[in-house]
Amino acid sequence: MKLISIYCYSLSLIVVLILMADPAKAHRENFDKMGVVPPRNEMPAPDFTLESLDGNTLSLQDFRGKTILLNFWATWCGPCKDELPAMQRLYEALRKDGVEIVAVSIDRDNKERVKEYIRKYNLTFPVLLDPDQKVRKNYFIMGLPTSYLIGVDGKLKGFVSGAREWDSTISKQMFSTLTN
């Protein structure tokens, strides 16, 4: 009887350890906690080329091989203002680990206002301009802020509508599972 008890206990412990070590489960749990909606089927993120604040053009392909947080925002959006500092802190913490943040401003013809905004909040990640909102339409953005998570393979991993605490422990764990 004692041998059976020890066997059952050992088996239970092994099952618990296996479940705890399941990275896919941890990935799903972090997505749920952050409010990330995964796609039904992973598909390549639509590529685009936009002007950056310094006048250069960048395309999404320029960031291939990195985990990307693609964020759509505007200077007039209150929740965007709330989340951008947290995105900067995330960028500073995880850039060396292959996480890139690309912020797409949908402000119309307000390049100087966007520049002033970026300076005010000391944002150092790439900011691109989509004044005609073609990229916004290609990504079906209905409200701001909206963010897409793109894996190192260039495929859409999920999207988030609304502001998030991007520098939270849960967020950092989520990006860690995406980069590995």
What are the residue ranges of the model-derived segments?
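Bacterial N-terminal signal peptides that target proteins for export
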Residues: 1-10
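Bacterial N-terminal signal peptides
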Residues: 9-18
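N-proximal helix/coil linker or "cap" segments that precede and/or mark the start of modular domains
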Residues: 20-47
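A short beta-strand-turn-helix
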Residues: 42, 47-68
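Short pre-active-site segment immediately N-terminal to redox-active cysteine/selenocysteine motifs
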Residues: 66-68, 72-76, 143
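Conserved redox-active cysteine motifs that mediate thiol-disulfide chemistry
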Residues: 72-89
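Thiol-based oxidoreductase modules, predominantly thioredoxin-like and allied folds used
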Residues: 98-111, 125-132
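Thiol/disulfide oxidoreductase modules built on the thioredoxin-like
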Residues: 116-124, 130-177
